[in-house]
């Protein structure tokens, strides 16, 4: 059997995740400190776990509606109105998915046809490009620079739009840079899009993890943008529910209807137990969100100060739970730096080029880990620089 001829070219050409590569290497290494995976180290709030247990004890284990439990969709709408000033019809404009990644997949599959172009600001989450390619779309990467605080510039977006452009992905707060887009930034982007037929996929999975003085703003709240925006969010990062696998998409009813049809065939429905647990998360856990954000904020300051004091310039992230230090002064590529650091000091980071070509010269550091782990990792990185004779301008 010639499997090479059987396998679809688009699937064969997919790059393995650069995140998982270093995570897997670290898993087999004794006394390794891995700062590679973006997963909260907090336990899911007890009230949420208890709600999941209660749903099982009451035998609520059957298929839910394909689009999700009505009660959950209603709570999602109440949450979005309360926290994000977004307004949706729970029966027609909300789809509950298996994590935010499935919501992204369903959105791209519903909108993108072969040959359509999808604009992806870069550096970016690793799944956008392969999902686009598998749908027959053409990824168009628009670099976001550190000198612009890793924000998408309207002039760069305008230059990237062609008659074939179908979708713009807006991944803010950003993974891996921690960049956020303020209201005025989003207004400039909306102005560029106003006279086009380009849809927006706004990935807001880190919306609650915002450390600036101004709250998160969704582009869908701007005049004329709700009708062209699919908002993706979920429970993994906000409520420390990564293993529960639950996300959602909200947007115009005609798009959500098509996404639900695809979801129906590909997935059927998101896990029932997770959905009952999520209802409690939305109703009762605003305080837990605030506590976790405060802890991440403290860790963020520790990591940013640590890298800057070593002489490795680190942009101050204002969202998510990642730092993106620049390692160009070491003279190594991102892959070389992360590989040597792992081999010599048993600290796992993710090379910046895993998030696109414009991530070269950087590495991603997740601070969703304990202060003890972060402090020890900073100590080992400092030793690594000294032992390799790297004069990075330590302060």
Model-found features: residue ranges?
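Conserved N-terminal alpha-helix of the aminotransferase class I/II PLP-enzyme fold
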Residues: 63-98
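Intrinsically disordered, tyrosine-centered linear signaling motifs in cytosolic regions
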Residues: 62-63, 206
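PLP-dependent class I/II
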Residues: 1-15, 22-29, 33, 37-55, ...
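Conserved nucleotide-sugar phosphate-binding/catalytic loop shared by glycosyltransferases and other
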Residues: 59
